[in-house]
Every structure is written in structure tokens, then in C-alpha cells.
């Protein structure tokens, strides 16, 4: 059994509700484990970080946790460099259109405006674990640079006491200032509080395992750092009709399963025929492409689903309830169907837009809200690293004209003696 097919309607709560509630993981038990680690790094700095690096990453800690990128000259395959440079260019070009304008307006003779100012220091977490993610470095650093962040560092676990040149090259191409070789909750704590050797950051972004997420949530709750949306397992929801290629749909489901055993891969369709063909293609692919096979199979068996609804409208209703990290729309009228999307991290339209294009090269960001957080969070972007500062310049004439309203409002709130007076004396 690779992936199950369910013929459902929106009222089939016993089948759909557990899926909708997926990965809204209770972090309380993880927070209990993470809190003492974070506090220990806060109190003992580099010494604690060395102990946890050896314990959790199972490597001899590096002599220095910090690599200044300007001093590094990574040697990588020319093809990898070309791909990283191309990806960086596309990411940069797409994110440039997100840079907001400072605006102003005149209301009753008063000038009011918006000024966008960047966060000053940011850390971008690049996971270690089961894969290397130079693409995540590009996705995190480039929008921060465009926003005007002056101090950007990568935080990532060391591999055998050092880092692959591919990660260093990505950091250099993206424009980061330094790399901090520390992972997990201890790495997040180090860049949040700072240590003897590691500068602190005001804001931390990027995906990671549950310990990284718990550390970010804890430190954010303590007011130490700002964070992007809390990260959970990777996920894709595909809406497809009978115009979709079942082999391609199956490949897209499996590309998500390749991330990890807890990854979520769902197909919603109005075609039972497509559902059956996709199921066959998934099983066939698991046999033909055995690399990371156990991981993919467990992901598909535990978290993979094919839902056959009576019509596409119900597919979109379910998708908006699910609020997927990645949403693929492989339908005849995919451009029209885009208007039905309310909640999704990133949308991939048509048969030629697999998630992997956005993961690596097209230019959109792959640091996305998961576990239904797309209902309230957006993808990482330039605005993630900007603050909106409002300003006003009030005229004497406006003071005279608007004071009566200030008087009424301040008296109603019981604050006229000082609030009202501060306007009254300027008339």
C-alpha cells in the first residue's frame, strides 16, 4: 500500500478533519527540552555551545564557530556555481518588485506618511540533517539584502567540524557577512543572545526541525528575537483534473515525500480515473527510484492521501481550509482557478510548474508557512525584514480646526488634563 484513495465530500469530517489538523504540533514537550539548552547557552556562551555541538551534531566542535565570508574562497564545481548564480539572479529579480515605496498623503492640511526601515541584524538558519540546502541560504539572504539589512549571518550545523564549499559559495553569492557553524536549539540561542565569539541578531528566519522551531518560538516569546512563521513538516497539495499527467502528479507528490518521513503529500481531484492512475504511478516510482526509498514510502503511507471530490469547487474549498505550504493547480483552466485560492504559501500553476522549480530556480521564495499557517502568514520576502514607520507633520491651522474633536475624545477617555492640554496650548 503506497497511497490511499478516498472518495469524499466536504462533510466527511472523520476522514478530512485529521488531515486538516496535521502537524499543528504541540510544542510543549519539545519546549521543555529546548528551554534549558537555550538558557545554558545564554549563561555560558561558547563553552555550552561546544558541549552541545559535540553531543547533538556528533562532531568535534570547530576551533572558531564564525567564518567571515569575505576571507573565504570556496572551490566548487563550475556547474554548481553557474546554477547558484542563476538562481540568485532570478530570486533577486523577483524580490525587487516587493520593495515598497515610501508614501505620503495630506489630510486636513496635515502631512502623513509611511517610512519603511530595515531590521539591522538578521540570522538565516540553513538546516543540516538529511540534506544540504544552499538554496535556503539564497532564499533567506537575498530578500534581507534587498530590504537593506546591514548585518546578515548564516547559522547552520557544522559537518565534520567544517562546512561544504557549496554552502559557503551560496552565502558569498547571496551577500551574507558571516557563517556561524552551530545548529539546532543551541545555534538559535547563540545567534539570539550572542556569545563571546558570535554576534547577536535581532531577527531569525529559516526552516528547521522541531528543536529549531521550538527555540525560535521560545526566544520570540521572551522578546529576545523576532521570527518568521514557525516551520513544520514540508507539504504539497495538488488540485488536478483529467487534463493532468498522472506520472507528473505522482512525481510531484514524491518530490515532497523526499524531504522527510513526516512530509505531507495530498492530491485532490474530481477524477477517479486520474486518482487510480496516480496511485499506480506512485507505487511504480517507489520501486524504480529507490534512493531515500524508506523515507519516501513512510511519508506517502503515513501522510499521503488522494481525495476524490465530486467537483473541483470542493477541492478548492478543502485546499483553503488546509492552507498548504505548496499548492499546485493542474487543471484545464488553471489561470481562472487561481482566483479561487485564498490561503496558500506559494502556488504553482499548470502542468509545467512543479514545486521544485520554486524550490530552486524560478525566483519565488521557498521559505513558506506550513501546517495551516498560510491562513495568517505569507512567504518570506522583502517585507519580512522591513518595519513600517508612520510619521506626521501637523499644521497650526489644523491644530485650531481639529482641537474641538480632540477635546471631546480626550474628555471621554478621561485624559483631557494632559492629552487635551498638549493640543490646547498650541492653538
Swiss-Prot record:
Any matching Pfam family: Histidinol_dh
Gene Ontology CC terms, in alphabetical order: cytosol
Binding-site residues, Zn(2+): 256, 259, 359, 419
EC main group: oxidoreductase
EC number: 1.1.1.23
Protein's pathway: Amino-acid biosynthesis; L-histidine biosynthesis; L-histidine from 5-phospho-alpha-D-ribose 1-diphosphate: step 9/9
Cofactor: Zn(2+)
Binding site for substrate: 234, 256, 259, 326, 359, 413, 419
GO molecular function: histidinol dehydrogenase activity; NAD binding; zinc ion binding
Entry binding sites for NAD(+): 125, 186, 209
Function summary: Catalyzes the sequential NAD-dependent oxidations of L-histidinol to L-histidinaldehyde and then to L-histidine.
Family, as annotated: Belongs to the histidinol dehydrogenase family.
Protein name as annotated: Histidinol dehydrogenase
Organism from which the protein derives: Leptospira interrogans serogroup Icterohaemorrhagiae serovar copenhageni (strain Fiocruz L1-130)
Gene: hisD
